[in-house]
């Protein structure tokens, strides 16, 4: 089929290509702007969140805030706000460890405090052990003797042996 206006068709195709490219760039800019705003917006607890839900953020070097006392059954939501990955785990008072998995930047993880929880729970990053938070659960119903019994017990000799192992491993030469 022969067209009567070949110059007009090629101009129309060029215009369509430019409009499509422009639309693609606008969509890409909007997508990047929404991602940037979401990752830097402050994380606030909304009024619709139940009272038994706590939110924390994980930055490059710390958990924040840690100014609440969770109760059994509470849910703790942790959002990775840093630009690096973390791998969070929780150590229970009896020494049990629960791995919450790897958190890439911008992701969120949830942990529910066990229904029978009492004592100190430690949140820590496998990759960056200096990043940790201690949460005292059910503090009102925790007697000091019950808390002390939850701590690991070591004999004097075990402590001395442990100290000796640490000191001797530091002094070893490769």
UniProtKB/Swiss-Prot annotation:
Probably involved in TTQ prosthetic group biosynthesis. Disulfide bonds: none annotated. Pathway: One-carbon metabolism; methylamine degradation. InterPro entries: Cupredoxin, MauL. The gene is mauL. It comes from the Bacteria. This is Methylamine utilization protein MauL.
